[in-house]
Regions:
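Amphipathic, heptad-repeat alpha-helical segments used for oligomerization and assembly
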Residues: 567, 736-751
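Conserved phosphate/anionic-ligand binding catalytic regions in large, soluble enzymes, centered on
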Residues: 694, 750-759
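Active-site "cap" helix and flanking loop/linker of ATP-utilizing ligase/carboxylase catalytic domains
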Residues: 684-720
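C-terminal glycine/acidic-rich active-site capping loop/insertion
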Residues: 723
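Structural alpha/beta core scaffold segments of enzyme domains
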Residues: 2-674, 705, 710, 717, ...
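Cytochrome P450 core scaffold surrounding the K-helix E-X-X-R motif
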Residues: 677-681
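Short, conserved loop/turn and helix-capping segments at secondary-structure boundaries
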Residues: 465-469, 684, 688-692, 753
């Protein structure tokens, strides 16, 4: 087993042996390894998940060492969201071990592909979201991968990291894994002592025989426990929240010590014996390819080995997204590869229809699409009759731009292909998809594709399951026997990604004489491949309106679109909450009380929780108290989707904003009332995610956009794609959790998207100007 002792002297970050695999032992990422261990990185004869014989596996999730160190295997990818910690807490709540001795470890995607889930993990107890021991139907059956139905109930159930599902979908079987391991340890101790198992108890990693007071540690009985048959299922009981001792407490992230001491291994850090480097340049216009290139110009450059053209990726391997063909230079170092690539003449073959597109004509096409028949998603009451009457009609059109993820770690992957095996080192949110792609590209059976998980320098909706993996696999397949490390430049990372789709929305309301809506019609338009087209609008409105219609409209563009923080919710939340603010102002009513009254009129089963969120946030902020000139407050309410029997996590925020007369915007304070349900796993992690989301969506509101010029994205680095600076972060963020009788839908990326609508309404209150197109830096925000 790789040494993970934090007391080892740390090397410089680039001297840390940067690989994510321990082929002779269980896969461990983020731990110090001396350079002498380089030769042990790859062991083609060994299974990627093989267990060190000195360490005993209790089950697929729990490994206990003789020194009582407990390793918890985590199937989801740590992106900074705290999943290593939260998922480990769920296992350890039931395992009842010493939390200070817990170490996280990535579970093996290879093992997941070979083994079936134990029968005892297939029973999900409870009757639904309101049952503290329930979760309704499991949402994690089957393997997540493209082009294949997969194997239902594979070992780790769900290895994709997305949709705010790591805690939500994992809680029950992870707690069961901890409970099963605990019972095996108890049975082993009872057997060793020759006593009934009913006479032994465990706490903090120590097993006690109650009548005699004898004790054993988990490490002492682990070898016997590993060989103990599965316990009686009746003994594997999951604790209700009232019995939690670890879950619900604030715990620092387990991965932080490794990161701050330079011991974490990211994909960009991987180094292998004999490894060569690949620098890549893709056609800047999506759907384009290489027309010609002149390798002779660089053949004799230092370190250059070859130039390889790669085709437009097979859509079957990358979710039908349109990317580009390109070319890579292979060299002894990345600097040599990149320098030669920049010197080499390349001519691109660009589809003329793509080159003719720009942001202006694409936006115009989306607006025109809303005038055509769309797909009606919701049609309640009789909107046509309501709009044809004597009601006052209020209409507004909003727009949001293309947005990338702008992650800190550029795309990269290291791949070694031999005649009978593929090894991949990558930070990946969908490892099974990447294994499937590797099998298709190389022709090597998927069972012989080994993915060694690395940490990621940000994901924000997607990482790994895109063209960097396919490109690296393609190049390594052309250089069998030689490890190829592909690393994108920052510019390549911008243009070889998928974007959140450009979008527009037209919202129309019919208001009665008192200013209350009697009908609302929503039309949205975005790229036809954009995910989340119905977010926020797909159910009966949370705000009471007797007549409601929602339709979606699409256009087919060549810019690849995909998941990006919150998917469709951030844009749609901006449309909806901004429109509610505008309706309140048109009616001459307080936006907080306007929302509160409309919610109270609905028959939604959880309207009391939404009102509680609004009331709490308003009270926290001092809503209604006077503010100095140039300052304003705005309120908004969020929930995600309608999963879990019509219930989802509820969050209300009040944004206090100041704007100088010169137009400088500052988010002074944010007050958040966030639903706790019947318990959060790690409240500290939730707080950090909420704070991070506030900063992220402030960027969306004020700065971030990608423009299309001659068919290509114009912004390709941080000099043209501005991000907020630390001085722009709100100096005060207050978060209050409130309990409800529900299990939560997950944190995800979209709990604080309403920063956008909050700033929009504050701009209106302070300057008298109503802007409906993001980002706001494009508008005149001065006032006098």
């Amino acid at each position: 087993m790789i040494n993970n002792d934090l007391d080892k002297p740390s090397l410089s970050r680039r001297d840390v042996l940067s690989t994510a695999a321990a082929a002779a032992g269980a896969l461990v990422v983020g731990f110090w390894m001396p350079k002498r261990a380089v030769a042990q990185i790859i062991n083609p004869a060994g299974a990627a998940w093989a267990v060190d014989p000195a360490v005993d596996e209790i089950n697929a999730w729990v490994v206990v060492a003789p020194d009582d160190t407990v390793t918890i295997r985590i199937a989801q990818t740590e992106l900074g969201q705290g999943v290593w910690t939260s998922n480990a807490m769920m296992v350890c709540e039931e395992l009842q071990c010493d939390w200070s001795k817990v170490r996280p470890q990535y579970a093996s995607a290879n093992r997941d592909g070979r083994e079936m889930a134990p029968e005892w993990t297939l029973e999900v107890m409870g009757k639904g979201a309101t049952d503290p021991l329930g979760g309704g139907e499991p949402q994690f059956g089957g393997r997540d991968r493209i082009g294949s139905t997969g194997i239902p109930n594979s070992l780790y159930r769900r290895m994709r990291t997305n949709a705010a599902a790591s805690v939500r979908d994992g809680r029950y079987y992870l707690q069961l894994a901890g409970a099963e391991a605990r019972e095996r340890l108890l049975l082993a101790a009872a057997k060793a002592w020759g006593v009934p198992v009913e006479e032994v108890r465990s706490a903090n990693g120590v097993i006690t025989h109650l009548p005699t007071g004898r004790t054993n540690t988990y490490g002492q009985v682990a070898p016997l426990a590993a060989r103990t048959p599965h316990p009686n299922p009746e003994r594997i009981r999951i604790k209700p929240p009232s019995e939690w001792t670890l879950m619900g407490t604030e715990q620092k992230n387990l991965d932080v010590p490794f990161k701050v001491t330079g011991k974490t291994v990211y994909g960009i850090d991987v180094r292998l014996p004999g490894m060569k480097w690949a620098a890549v340049k893709s056609c800047p216009v999506y759907g384009g390819k290489v027309k010609s290139y002149d390798f002779e110009r660089i053949r004799n450059q230092p370190g250059v080995i070859s130039a390889i053209e790669f085709p437009i990726p097979d859509p079957a391997l990358i979710r039908d997204r349109v990317f580009s063909g390109g070319i890579a230079v292979i060299a002894d170092s990345w600097y040599q590869a990149k320098t030669a690539l920049d010197m080499m003449p390349i001519e691109w073959d660009v589809p003329p229809k793509h080159a003719a597109l720009n942001s202006a004509n694409m936006r115009a096409a989306l607006i025109a699409a809303m005038d055509k028949p769309g797909k009606v998603r919701v049609n309640l009451g009789d909107c046509d009759r309501a709009f044809s009457g004597r009601a006052k009609i209020f209409e507004a059109t909003y727009s949001t731009p293309y947005l990338p993820r702008a992650r800190m770690e550029p795309g990269n992957a290291t791949v070694l292909v031999t005649d009978d095996r593929v090894d991949i080192w990558i930070g990946d949110q969908s490892p099974q998809e990447t294994r499937f792609s590797a099998s298709k590209i190389t022709g090597i059976p998927e069972q012989d594709v080994y993915l060694h998980m690395c940490h990621l320098g940000g994901g924000f909706g997607r990482n790994g399951n895109g063209p960097q993996a396919e490109q690296a696999i393609y190049l390594a397949n052309q250089n069998r026997g030689t490890p190829i490390h592909l690393l994108w430049t920052r510019e390549e990372d911008f243009i070889s990604t998928t974007y959140r789709s450009m979008g527009v929305a037209r919202l129309r309301a019919a208001l009665n004489a008192d200013g209350w809506p009697i009908a609302i019609e929503v039309r949205t338009a975005m790229d036809e491949q954009a995910p989340g087209p119905t977010a926020c609008f797909d159910k009966a409105s949370r705000y009471y309106v007797p007549n409601y219609r929602f339709s979606t409209h699409t256009e087919a563009f060549h810019i690849p679109v995909g998941t990006r923080r919150g998917v469709g919710t951030p844009a749609h939340d901006f449309y909806r909450e901004s429109f509610m603010d505008e309706l309140a102002h048109a009616a001459g009513k307080d936006p907080y009380l306007y929302r509160r009254e409309l919610i109270s009129r609905t028959n939604l089963p959880y309207k009391a929780d939404m009102i509680k969120a609004l009331d709490t946030a308003a009270e926290m902020s001092g809503w209604g108290t006077p503010l100095p000139q140039g300052m304003a407050r705005a309120i908004a309410l969020e929930e995600r989707g309608a999963e879990a029997g019509g219930h989802a996590t509820i969050s209300a925020q009040v944004h206090t904003v100041s704007i100088s007369k010169e137009g400088e915007v500052r988010l002074e304070r944010v007050d958040v009332a966030h639903e706790e349900g019947f318990g959060l796993v790690n409240p500290l992690s939730v707080r950090k995610q909420l704070e991070g989301q506030i900063t992220w969506f402030y960027n969306d509101a004020m700065h971030q956009e990608c423009n299309v010029t001659e068919g290509r994205i114009a912004e390709n680095n941080f000099d043209t794609f501005p991000l907020s600076r630390i001085k722009e972060d709100p100096p005060e963020i207050n978060i209050t959790f409130f309990k409800t009788g529900h299990w939560l839908n997950g944190m995800g990326h979209d709990r604080c998207t309403s920063v956008q609508s909050g700033i929009a309404d504050a701009i209106f209150q302070i300057t008298g100007k109503r802007y409906r197109d993001l980002p706001f830096r494009n508008h005149d925000l001065t006032w006098s």
